[in-house]
Amino acid sequence: MKIDILDKGFVELVDVMGNDLSAVRAARVSFDMGLKDEERDRHLIEYLMRYGHETPFEHIVFTFHVKAPIFVARQWFRHRIASYNELSGRYSKLSYEFYIPSPERLEGYKTTIPPEQVTEKISEIVDKAYRTYLELIESGVPREVARIVLPLNLYTRFFWTVNARSLMNFLNLRADSHAQWEIQQYALAIARIFKEKCPWTFEAFLKYAYKGDILKEVQV
């Protein structure tokens, strides 16, 4: 499952271990019990979520492949209860792939220049920076040094492996109007995948544990 984000980004589900019933099994092992019928299993998930018994959800694990601007990735990496591997600018020649916000992104802000000119200025700076990057590499400058001229809207790619408990914490903080708009878009994509793979857990999360706002306002 792959969802396109922004102008060139994406979130792709690479792997998932477990589902709603994984949390049920983990919770009932305390009483040396397993699965019951669907109604009672689903009720247990709601009970766990309502009363903050979150460790059973750590037995559901997702791996995502993400392509995002560096400034989004740096916010993302603050969520530390997870595993990350990122594209290396030391060992790889970085591609000309930059996030250019549309003029509509600036609607509602009191800028002294038109939004279209903002987009043009960003594009001009990106072009100059990337040309300089290539010139430095062609001059023999190592990639690890040449890359420092590139701006934060350069796209990077990384793998993110995270359990459902930490994923829900990510959604609480990033699927929220206080987060930057760009990372909100990625959080919505993560929520959509989470809902598809763990519908009972997602529904209980929204009902009892979600602290943000935008997931209750949009259809994921």
Swiss-Prot record:
Pfam families in alphabetical order: Thy1
Domain named ThyX: residues: 1-208
Role summary: Catalyzes the reductive methylation of 2'-deoxyuridine-5'-monophosphate (dUMP) to 2'-deoxythymidine-5'-monophosphate (dTMP) while utilizing 5,10-methylenetetrahydrofolate (mTHF) as the methyl donor, and NADPH and FADH(2) as the reductant.
Enzyme Commission number(s): 2.1.1.148
Designated name of the protein: Flavin-dependent thymidylate synthase
PROSITE patterns: THYX
Pathway participation: Pyrimidine metabolism; dTTP biosynthesis
InterPro entries associated with the record: Thymidylate_synthase_ThyX, Thymidylate_synthase_ThyX_sf
Alphabetized NCBIfam families for the sequence: thyX
